[in-house]
Amino acid sequence: PGSRVVEAGTGTAALTSAIAHYIRPTGRVYTYEIRQEFQKNAKKNLERAGLLDVVELKEGDVTQGIEEKDLDAVILDMATPWLVIPHAYTALKGSGVLVSFSPTIDQVVKVVEALEEHGFVCVETVETLIRFMQVARGKTRPQTVMTGHTGYLTFARKAIMVQQES
């Protein structure tokens, strides 16, 4: 509760809604979407969920900058998240968290390189997948055929540079 979060890639506002529930009543989600039709649909979904009091919908491209400052977190679900890393660093408060979802490993590599270049620390990437199990006494195992899509979540924290007195 009370956190200030920027999300880029509002989509249908499913993740926006989850974040809003977590940070309310005193927090704020600023969610950016470049596609106007997605933003209209997201607004309807947020109205139905009763969450517009803690969500600010913004039509804009975060690769051009993030207006908000002193943020607790920046969450990216977009095609070119590495282009947002310098803006996220400026927008986050010290020790703020960045999370990026990428469907391809090539995107992950670009994100991690940008994070390291801009001074983020504690950079970790995990793969997300669903694997169904065949459960039977004495012979439980993963299903033989797995149809699904994997994705990758990359986490990082903004480091604060502290100058030591000499």
Which positions does each model-derived feature cover?
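N-terminal Rossmann-like NAD(P) cofactor-binding module of classical short-chain dehydrogenase/reductase
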Residues: 6, 75, 99
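C-terminal substrate-binding/active-site "lid" region of AdoMet-derived donor-dependent transferases
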Residues: 82-152
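Conserved SAM-binding loop of SAM-dependent methyltransferases across substrates and taxa
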Residues: 12-25, 89-90
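Conserved class I S-adenosyl-L-methionine
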Residues: 2-11
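C-terminal lobe and adjacent flexible extensions of AdoMet/dcAdoMet transferase-like proteins
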Residues: 156-166
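S-adenosyl-L-methionine
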Residues: 32-81
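Short beta-strand element of Class I
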Residues: 26-30, 98
